[in-house]
Amino acid sequence: MQVVFSPGAEIKFEGANNFRELGGYRAADGRRVKYGLLYRGGNLDLLKSEADHARLASLGLREILDLRSAGESAAHPDPAVPGAHYQRVCGMRNADGTEMDFSGQGIERLDRKSLRQEKEAFERSVGRPVHDFEWFSALYREMPFRNPAYHALFALLEGRRVPVLFHCSCGKDRTGIGAMLILLALGVSRADALVDYMLTNVYRREIIERFLADKPAAERDLLLPVEGVSEPMGAGAIDEILRRYPSYEAYFADEFGLDAARLKALRDFYLE
């Protein structure tokens, strides 16, 4: 018996949170995204129990797309899932094209050198000092463009290699932007795409609250994206599309080669 979830509902696991599917969201033409095909999540290494492994296997996954860096994946490797093909394509990259590594050691290295250099380069481009939040928002706005991870994701969708699970470490940033792009491609509204994006703060509420508990109140909004997501950052990423293109359809045609015929075929397959 297939279990049907309401749009954005969390799929419960003992060891992980923020695991859900994209089924149920309504597109502009009145159809809804099909259930049981498009899954999003975080670190699968957190699924330790037999019950969690059985639950994951029950999804019948054909593809797992890991959006993490090599360092993150090596530190917390995905478990083998029967019948699922695994590939890894990092979802965030530095200006020079190298992977942005959010593993423990990677973050330490980034803090010391790479992130500082990236931020300084951004400040030179805008001609003034910027706050970390503004700089990271700028990184977010670049994520939908020329991103090999999202090209791999849409190739799986067009190839109908589903059910597919795409995930990163927390299921919020690289995964969240990817999920919004899928929903927009299927004709779901910007508002509903952002609703799905912001649900991370619901399913990671306890983690976020623990992290922010000892932080100054004036800094909590700025620090929220460390463990949660920021609506201005998520909105900024997809609104940047309309700043560069006259429509989402024009973006999908130029970025992924999804002309009108291919976009219609994608929607006909994933909507009902």
Stretches with model-predicted labels:
Residues 170, 174-175:
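Ser/Thr-glycine-rich phosphate-binding loops at phosphate-binding pockets of nucleotides
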Residues 1-165, 177-272:
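Cys-dependent protein tyrosine phosphatase-like superfamily
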